[in-house]
Each structure stands twice: as C-alpha cells, then as structure tokens.
Amino acid sequence: MADYFATLTIPKNTIPPNISSTTVTIEGDILVGFYRLIPPGWAGLAHYRIKYGLEQLHPANEGAWDTGDNIRDFVPLNWKMPEHKLTLTIEGYNEDTSYDHTVYLWFRTEELEYARPTTLLKEILSLLKEIFGVEG
C-alpha cells in the first residue's frame, strides 16, 4: 500500500479552456481511491477533475468537474491500473474573481496480491497451519 500526495492551486479567473493542471506519478496495481480536502471558501466556484491520459477517472461521468466547499472525505475508485507506474493529471478551473483555491489529494494504491481477499485468507490459513503444526 502506498500513498501519493498532490495539490493543485487554481488561480482566480481561470475559465475553460484556460485551465490549470498538475501531475502526480503513482505506482501500484489498483488505485483504491483518494482522500480529498476542499477547504472552506471554495463556495462551489473552483472545480477539478482527475484524468489518466484521455480517460477521466473522477468524476466518473466524462466532461464533468467536481466542486464543493469544506469537504474532507475518501473517494473510492478501485481502478485496475493499466500500468504499474503511471502519471495522473489533475485539472482545474476557478470562477472566483477574488481568490485562488487549492485542492489537496492523497492517492492510495495497492499491489494486486494485497488487494485480493483470497490472498490474505491463504496467508492466514498458512500461518494457522504453521502455528498448530499441521502439514499440507
């Protein structure tokens, strides 16, 4: 399991097609999801989305943007990564005429062997067999 941190500060008056963007490189087999912090003050005026190449990962509906105000939560994705190491792009725009706004993101990845419950159960069974001296 690994966590990768990214921020995107979106300058005021940044309206599409003039958007801000940043990238984050992550490693793993499964992008479990991400924690997000949208600080107070956004008032729904700043917007962001997460993409892998041309594929939009969040929000799930293509062409949509996420926004909010004072949000701290985890967004599950459970996305099987097409490459073990890849780069995500975070894009944003800001309708606010007075302030820049920043979104804070922590991406959580896992290796496939740890993401599968059956692997964990096999490890537990193997450990129990070892503890109790059972062979096979």
Residue ranges and their predicted role:
Residues 1-28, 38-136:
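Beta-strand-centric surfaces of beta-sandwich/beta-rich domains
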